[in-house]
């Protein structure tokens, strides 16, 4: 098995994201090790020695994905016996030529706090998502960028939090529960903000599996109950012309991207 090292003088998030995207194209398993904040020559030497030791023990050359700004630190890490892939310089040099401007490398620029307003906006969005989770309150819906609606356990909460943390979007979510299913209608707070509504649904069998993990062998988790609730809620979506998405086979990242594409919501953070 190949060992993959993600090394950076910052958080290593960028190296991980790019690396995961590349490795996902291969039907192989990898041992993955992340080493952030390699900011000194001494730390770089330790990383080089660790990579070389891994090679010595396994006999398989490790793969190294790195985003290191400092030239000396980067060169020390690159002495390691590894297949090295530099995401920053791969793109920086061609862009310098295209833009006619020299890059000005700086530590922690990507995921640091250089832009305090963007950071504050993201924290406020996360706080908003938590305060408006699961229909706790509907008083702040006028401040929401989007309101996700659907049955319990269809993916509303993780999607709301991801939209907030990743994009600074104020996402509220509201659940339809069993007691709502008799004559299902939009509550007044949702009607007043119907232009912000976006529905989530899910395959009955998948919902049954998820609910069974939380409350096994209950009416709440029974396949029949899941089928009835979903049929009722999807009927409401169609009657009210509310856009909705089946989350059954999508990750939270994919769900969020599809919502942004469908709604045209502007990504606040990059």
From Swiss-Prot:
GO terms for molecular function: ADP binding; ATP binding; phosphotransferase activity, phosphate group as acceptor; protein serine/threonine kinase activity. ADP binds at residues 150-157. It is an enzyme of class 2 (transferase). It comes from Aeromonas hydrophila subsp. hydrophila (strain ATCC 7966 / DSM 30187 / BCRC 13018 / CCUG 14551 / JCM 1027 / KCTC 2358 / NCIMB 9240 / NCTC 8049). HAMAP family: PSRP. It catalyses: [pyruvate, water dikinase] + ADP = [pyruvate, water dikinase]-phosphate + AMP + H(+); [pyruvate, water dikinase]-phosphate + phosphate + H(+) = [pyruvate, water dikinase] + diphosphate. Its EC number is 2.7.11.33, 2.7.4.28. It comes from the Bacteria. This is Putative phosphoenolpyruvate synthase regulatory protein. Belongs to the pyruvate, phosphate/water dikinase regulatory protein family. PSRP subfamily. Keywords: Kinase, Nucleotide-binding, Serine/threonine-protein kinase, Transferase. PANTHER family: PYRUVATE, PHOSPHATE DIKINASE REGULATORY PROTEIN 1, CHLOROPLASTIC.
């Amino acid at each position: 098995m190949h060992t993959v090292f993600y090394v950076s003088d910052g958080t290593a998030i960028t190296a991980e994201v790019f690396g995961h995207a590349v490795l996902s194209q291969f039907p192989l398993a990898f041992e993955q090790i992340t080493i952030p904040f390699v900011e000194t020559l001494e730390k770089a030497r330790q990383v080089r020695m660790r990579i070389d030791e891994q090679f010595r023990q396994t006999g398989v050359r490790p793969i190294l994905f790195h985003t290191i700004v400092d030239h000396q630190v980067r060169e020390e890490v690159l002495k390691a016996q590894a297949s090295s892939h530099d995401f920053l310089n791969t793109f920086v040099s061609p862009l310098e030529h295209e833009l006619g401007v020299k890059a000005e490398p700086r530590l922690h620029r990507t995921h640091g706090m250089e832009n305090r307003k963007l950071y504050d906006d993201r924290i406020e969005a996360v706080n908003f998502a938590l305060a408006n989770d699961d229909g706790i309150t509907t008083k702040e819906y006028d401040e929401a960028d989007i309101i996700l609606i659907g049955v319990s356990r269809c993916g509303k909460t993780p999607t709301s939090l991801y939209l907030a943390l990743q994009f600074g979007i104020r996402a509220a979510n509201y659940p339809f529960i069993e007691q709502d299913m008799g004559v299902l209608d939009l509550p007044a707070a949702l009607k007043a903000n119907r232009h912000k509504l976006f529905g989530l649904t899910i395959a009955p069998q998948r919902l049954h599996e998820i609910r069974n993990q939380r409350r096994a062998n209950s009416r709440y988790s029974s396949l029949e109950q899941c089928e009835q609730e979903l049929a009722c809620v999807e009927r409401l979506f169609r009657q009210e012309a509310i856009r909705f998405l089946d989350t059954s086979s999508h990750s939270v990242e994919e769900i969020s991207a599809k919502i942004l594409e469908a709604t045209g919501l502007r990504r606040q953070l990059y």
